[in-house]
Curated annotation (Swiss-Prot):
Signal peptide: none
A Pfam entry, by short name: Tombus_movement
GO cellular component assignments: host cell wall
Nucleus in keyword set: no
Family, per entry: Belongs to the carmovirus/necrovirus/panicovirus movement protein p8 family.
Residues covered by region (Disordered): 1-48
Name under which the protein is recorded: Probable movement protein p8
Role: Cell-to-cell movement.
Domain of life: Viruses
Lineage, highest ranks first: Viruses, Riboviria, Orthornavirae, Kitrinoviricota, Tolucaviricetes
Residue stretches of biased makeup (Polar residues): 1-12
Natural source organism: Panicum mosaic virus (strain United States/Kansas 109S)
GO biological process: transport of virus in host, cell to cell
Annotated Basic and acidic residues bias: 16-27
Length: 73
């Protein structure tokens, strides 16, 4: 059976400090805020669309009533 010898090291292997950690966290936070803002815009757009449909229904009903009165009188 053979053995593999490794050279002795004078220092412990260290990992370089993560200098971009704060930048990465800021980018992640910005991405989350961007997604949240997009969801908010979508919700507002949907609400606006519902209000527009409701308003259109009122206008169409008013037109029908007006046409009925004009036809009958």
């Amino acid at each position: 059976m053979s053995t593999v010898e490794t050279p002795a090291q004078d220092t412990l292997a260290t990992k370089e400090p993560n200098k971009t950690g704060a930048k990465d966290r800021q980018q992640a936070r910005s991405a989350r805020l961007s997604v949240a803002a997009g969801a908010g815009r979508t919700a507002l757009s949907q609400r606006d669309a519902q209000e527009d449909r409701f308003s259109l229904g009122i206008v169409q009903t008013a037109d029908k009533i007006e046409n009925t009165f004009n036809f009958n009188f």
